[in-house]
């Protein structure tokens, strides 16, 4: 049976891979990207295989209406919240108020908005599935990634509660916790600045190694 998938942040990395896998399995795919024109140039195979690009910015409240409109036009069975390609690295005490909100915006508020936009249509077109892409950092809490781990923990907590809310409607909520993979994740966030008090400590070594790994993958 063919379902309609909507995948957020599908222009590169894991999101693009999921979109292509769904297309190859015979499903319909709506690939979300902040700049569809650029995305279609970077990943033309998604459109060539029948995928539809959608301008989708989950950092704005309007994303709810954008998803609702797309669902009305194409249908919607599966939502993939491909959040997490951005991680602020550094010592917790050094993060600014803006950075605190920025990390939560990317990995928590954005996916929640997408879910809110999709739910009315998912309920109407059973069965439905919501995939929230999380991380093993929620389990291990890697040194130097405190904000990232917190944002993923928030998404997983909401997912567990939502599982109970939606079970009666035939909608599954699944959390995916991928480990290390060959994407540009390590280079997506800004280079960490380590406070003087932490220079030479374990957290300093881990952060600098993360930067080195990112450089090796480019």
Curated annotation (Swiss-Prot):
Keyword NADP: yes
Pathway terms, separated by semicolons: Pigment biosynthesis
Enzyme's top EC category: oxidoreductase
Induction: Expression is positively regulated by the transcriptional regulator wor1. Expression is down-regulated during biotrophic growth within tomato leaves. The expression is induced at later stages of infection when conidiophores emerge from the plant and produce conidia.
GO molecular function, one term: oxidoreductase activity
Superkingdom in the source lineage: Eukaryota
Keyword set, alphabetical order: NADP, Oxidoreductase
Active site, per annotation: 134, 148, 152
Function as written in the Swiss-Prot or TrEMBL entry: Oxidoreductase; part of the gene cluster that mediates the biosynthesis of the bianthraquinone cladofulvin, a conidial pigment not required for virulence but that plays a role in fitness and resistance to environmental stresses including UV light and low-temperature stress. The pathway begins with the synthesis of atrochrysone thioester by the polyketide synthase (PKS) claG. The atrochrysone carboxyl ACP thioesterase claF then breaks the thioester bond and releases the atrochrysone carboxylic acid from claG.
Protein name as it appears in the record: Oxidoreductase claN
UniProt source species: Passalora fulva (Tomato leaf mold)
Lineage: Eukaryota, Fungi, Dikarya, Ascomycota, Pezizomycotina
Protein encoded by which gene: claN
């Amino acid at each position: 049976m063919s379902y309609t998938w909507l995948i957020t942040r599908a222009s590169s990395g894991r999101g693009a891979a999921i979109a292509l896998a769904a297309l190859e399995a015979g499903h319909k795919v709506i690939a979300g990207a902040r700049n569809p024109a650029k995305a279609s140039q970077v990943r033309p195979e998604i459109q060539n295989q029948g995928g539809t690009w959608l301008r989708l910015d989950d950092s704005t409240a309007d994303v709810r209406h954008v998803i609702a409109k797309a669902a009305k036009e194409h249908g919607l069975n599966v939502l993939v919240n491909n959040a997490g390609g951005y991680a602020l690295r550094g010592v917790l005490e050094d993060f600014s108020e803006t950075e605190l909100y920025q990390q939560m915006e990317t990995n928590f508020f954005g996916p929640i908005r997408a879910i809110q936009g999709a739910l009315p249509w998912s309920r109407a077109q059973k069965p439905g599935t919501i995939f929230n892409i999380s991380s093993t950092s929620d389990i291990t809490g890697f040194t130097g990634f405190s904000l990232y781990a917190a944002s993923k923990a928030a998404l997983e907590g909401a997912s567990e509660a939502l599982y109970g809310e939606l079970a009666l409607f035939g909608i599954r909520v699944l959390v995916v916790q991928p480990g290390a993979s060959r994407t540009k994740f390590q280079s997506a966030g800004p280079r960490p600045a380590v406070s003087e008090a932490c220079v030479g400590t374990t957290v300093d070594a881990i952060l600098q190694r993360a930067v080195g790994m990112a450089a090796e993958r480019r």
